[in-house]
Curated annotation (Swiss-Prot):
Domain of life: Bacteria
Residues engaged in binding substrate: N79, H85, D92, M106, S107, R116
PROSITE patterns referenced in this protein's UniProt entry, alphabetically: DEHYDROQUINASE_II
Protein name in the entry: 3-dehydroquinate dehydratase
Role summary: Catalyzes a trans-dehydration via an enolate intermediate.
């Protein structure tokens, strides 16, 4: 059986990421979230992925989006921002819907302050990409698309 080509992926960005390009440019550079989303939409076309994007400074909005993604999306790419290190609720939402998730960070969180070294999201994600600037997002999108397609190939094996 042929594998459905088009994947549906939700990109979530947490608190303060709307300030990319203006905030801590020595850490994050001058690229804006709008720039990142434009690039990802082009990448998504090449990957045959339907990409939806949402940024919120509010934990509950992100949790609602994760809940709403259940049954509508195949996977998630998330940069939880500061919620990475604090939000059990965000972690539980991801675990609860069971959607494959890739966690991304522009900076290498393990080369920064020690409080950034712990992620509540990583244990429920299929992978984590950090330290490649805006390319962390591009790598994250490619990673989730590859993961989902490989999983679909296994599910659609020759005798199924």
């Amino acid at each position: 059986m042929p594998i459905a080509a088009s994947l549906r992926v939700l990109l979530l960005n947490g608190p303060n990421l709307s300030l990319l390009g203006r905030r801590e440019v020595d850490v994050y550079g001058t690229v804006t979230l709008a720039d990142i989303e434009r690039t990802l939409q082009l990448d998504a076309q090449d990957l045959d992925v339907e990409l939806s994007c949402l940024q919120s400074n509010h934990e509950g909005v992100l949790i609602d989006a994760i809940h709403d993604a259940f049954g509508r999306c195949d996977g998630l790419v998330i940069n939880p921002g500061g919620l990475t290190h604090t939000s059990v609720a965000l972690r539980d939402a991801i675990a609860g819907v069971g959607l494959p998730t890739v966690e991304v960070h522009m900076s290498n969180v393990y080369r920064r302050e020690s409080f950034r070294h712990h992620s509540f999201i990583a244990p429920v994600a299929v992978g984590q990409i950090s330290g490649f600037g805006a390319d962390s997002y591009r790598l994250g999108l490619r990673a989730i698309a590859l993961f989902l397609r490989r999983r679909a190939e296994q599910d659609e094996g020759p005798c199924r």
